[in-house]
């Protein structure tokens, strides 16, 4: 039989009061004596519940504007006391056992996220008594239940009903794990906040100091286990951040289809982040984390049709992302034309979902509409370390471009150049993108030499019978030699957009002039590894 412990006395002290009244009512109905502090005690008393203030129980008042409330031997002795071992000393000092502690902590993260939050505001929202009680109860989980999540309230009452008012050791142990996770995450937030300020005391700007603290503490919550990882011999799971502020694959809701795989999630992220770059109705098709077709148009149906035409072979089994609602007509076009792993869009109509439901393996996700992109950090794991950098949210407008060639680009060439520049940002380096009339016609990805990426883009376009002549070409980084320009000219490229910055820029520009190509510098690189 599980080591059951009856719950006869509970201490409740919560900042997030959602569900606490109902939980306290359920405990009282089962004969549990309630201890509480401050606002929680007042709330319970106002609801007519019999509750004893901790200050009355300890005989010691709350003091220092509530800074000292529960830091008392009668509280922590009641929590930490080992049943059957410390009973004598507890009786000697009038310490009653506390069988359950229900605590959640001051809202530190919400406080420091507020605009204009001062250091003093942050300091006053560092909980001391709460984490101390949580850790005490978790340490003594053999005898005490610690509850830090309101989502556990109902399950706890159900188990008490099934066990004559008791909780099993398995449950107490599971609750203790959640408690230690809770305090670890809480302390990490505080450490990150204060750690980010240390360099500021030595003359660095707060903005620079806030990006990269001396010690980086990360907290992610497991959303799901994967059948396997990138390959079948690798185990994997998907973890997400709390309080994600931007529509993303992490916040998306899966409406239908089988469970997402590791590779599905990685590819869906690549597709969604790319389609976010466009304001017009857009479609991005991704395979192995690389766009294989991108287009914008007046409707997502036409955008999909044009994106698909870039590379139908690679689109098979791909991921499709839209920046508008998935409608029935577009859903039908996809299902009728190709095998698709995942479709993600801000929303999906009921009619569209009825159509995609006919294909049980098709996963349909919605992520909600997005506004501005949210700055943050990107991480890359290396053996024994972690590379951390700002998220690449760099963008250029037409007014920021520099035309360095003799020939000026036409309006259409300029539009195509900006379009394929946005796409190139999401193609693995070395990246070359050919585009014409707001659709990709050839994409060369991941080659060790830039000229071979350019050649592959041309081969792709030729294989699909797409006209390259008059197209724009984007390169994610500068051309180190003129050979990439010569290769582009050979297939009919008339406009090139690239960062510039090579020691041979003059040679590259001269090649563009020699071929009558308009060349644009962005002064911004978009390596992607």
UniProtKB/Swiss-Prot annotation:
<keyword id="KW-0658">Purine biosynthesis</keyword>
<dbReference type="Pfam" id="PF02142">
    <property type="entry name" value="MGS"/>
</dbReference>
<dbReference type="InterPro" id="IPR016193">
    <property type="entry name" value="Cytidine_deaminase-like"/>
</dbReference>
<dbReference type="Pfam" id="PF01808">
    <property type="entry name" value="AICARFT_IMPCHas"/>
</dbReference>
<dbReference type="GO" id="GO:0003937">
    <property type="term" value="F:IMP cyclohydrolase activity"/>
</dbReference>
<dbReference type="GO" id="GO:0005829">
    <property type="term" value="C:cytosol"/>
</dbReference>
<dbReference type="GO" id="GO:0006189">
    <property type="term" value="P:'de novo' IMP biosynthetic process"/>
</dbReference>
<comment type="pathway">
    <text>Purine metabolism; IMP biosynthesis via de novo pathway; 5-formamido-1-(5-phospho-D-ribosyl)imidazole-4-carboxamide from 5-amino-1-(5-phospho-D-ribosyl)imidazole-4-carboxamide (10-formyl THF route): step 1/1.</text>
</comment>
<keyword id="KW-0808">Transferase</keyword>
<protein>
    <recommendedName>
        <fullName>Bifunctional purine biosynthesis protein PurH</fullName>
        <ecNumber>2.1.2.3</ecNumber>
        <ecNumber>3.5.4.10</ecNumber>
    </recommendedName>
</protein>
<comment type="pathway">
    <text>Purine metabolism; IMP biosynthesis via de novo pathway; IMP from 5-formamido-1-(5-phospho-D-ribosyl)imidazole-4-carboxamide: step 1/1.</text>
</comment>
<comment type="similarity">
    <text>Belongs to the PurH family.</text>
</comment>
<keyword id="KW-0511">Multifunctional enzyme</keyword>
<dbReference type="InterPro" id="IPR036914">
    <property type="entry name" value="MGS-like_dom_sf"/>
</dbReference>
<feature type="domain" description="MGS-like">
    <location>
        <begin position="1"/>
        <end position="148"/>
    </location>
</feature>
<dbReference type="GO" id="GO:0004643">
    <property type="term" value="F:phosphoribosylaminoimidazolecarboxamide formyltransferase activity"/>
</dbReference>
<dbReference type="InterPro" id="IPR002695">
    <property type="entry name" value="PurH-like"/>
</dbReference>
<dbReference type="InterPro" id="IPR011607">
    <property type="entry name" value="MGS-like_dom"/>
</dbReference>
<dbReference type="InterPro" id="IPR024051">
    <property type="entry name" value="AICAR_Tfase_dup_dom_sf"/>
</dbReference>
<keyword id="KW-0378">Hydrolase</keyword>
